[in-house]
């Protein structure tokens, strides 16, 4: 696996080019501002009615429609929600691309699952910071950066990889390390991680633990602290030094209990289900299901959102978080 740093990337591959960042959400604002402050010529492409137009202009960025920004640009970074990209690409991006342009993405979903199929005369690259946008922005302003993944899907000009590395450098990523991968590997591992561990697995584990304690007669407040609130303390230890750092930092009681009881929860049957989830990502079944869900008006997703928001852990959690003066209230 190739890892690149400051000396491996040259901003010259982006200097003098017009760069459009489509979208101004979590990642979009970080990409646009970091590239602008790296001395590059950037504009933001948004719907005219978007509330983000005013925010981008207030930050000193030029704002145009998606079509206008694409037509003006040599390099176009698509940072719109996955489910919106195909329609916007077909209507406003593709008609305004010309041979030799570069089309960039922050995630490979639409390229990998062939929702978007660019012309062969276009460079297609991916630059994916492995952090939320606010952290991409904050570390840049502090003179640092976050690790990034890059991939080249199509190299029409012979400069696609150099452009991807230069973009990662302009984000600050080469100060932390830039890993070269493929669209396929980024997409499939990202989706699996979200579903089986980060967003799906962890949420269900938290709820099951909370419910087990409450059903046994313990106060909801204690159940919340033990199964939700304190999870951050453990994850921070993982983040800083891996599993060993966590085991070293907790009590012997916690370490022994975790090592002997944890495998009783995450059994071979659970791992077998993980493999099924991965297969659904790999063969496109999840992508088709998600696209159909979006096209159908999010009926199942909205139902699931309502069920989750009504869970007891959400209600007691909101009450307890109001008592935590150190939390930034939003």
Curated annotation (Swiss-Prot):
Binding site for NADP(+): 24-27, 47, 50, 52, 82-85, 133
EC assignment: 1.1.1.86
Cofactor requirement: Mg(2+)
Residues binding substrate, per UniProt: 251
Known catalytic reactions: (2R)-2,3-dihydroxy-3-methylbutanoate + NADP(+) = (2S)-2-acetolactate + NADPH + H(+); (2R,3R)-2,3-dihydroxy-3-methylpentanoate + NADP(+) = (S)-2-ethyl-2-hydroxy-3-oxobutanoate + NADPH + H(+)
Claim: Cell cycle is one of the keywords in the record: no
Domain KARI N-terminal Rossmann: 1-181
Main function: Involved in the biosynthesis of branched-chain amino acids (BCAA). Catalyzes an alkyl-migration followed by a ketol-acid reduction of (S)-2-acetolactate (S2AL) to yield (R)-2,3-dihydroxy-isovalerate. In the isomerase reaction, S2AL is rearranged via a Mg-dependent methyl migration to produce 3-hydroxy-3-methyl-2-ketobutyrate (HMKB). In the reductase reaction, this 2-ketoacid undergoes a metal-dependent reduction by NADPH to yield (R)-2,3-dihydroxy-isovalerate.
Cross-referenced HAMAP family: IlvC
Name this polypeptide is given: Ketol-acid reductoisomerase (NADP(+))
Gene this protein is translated from: ilvC
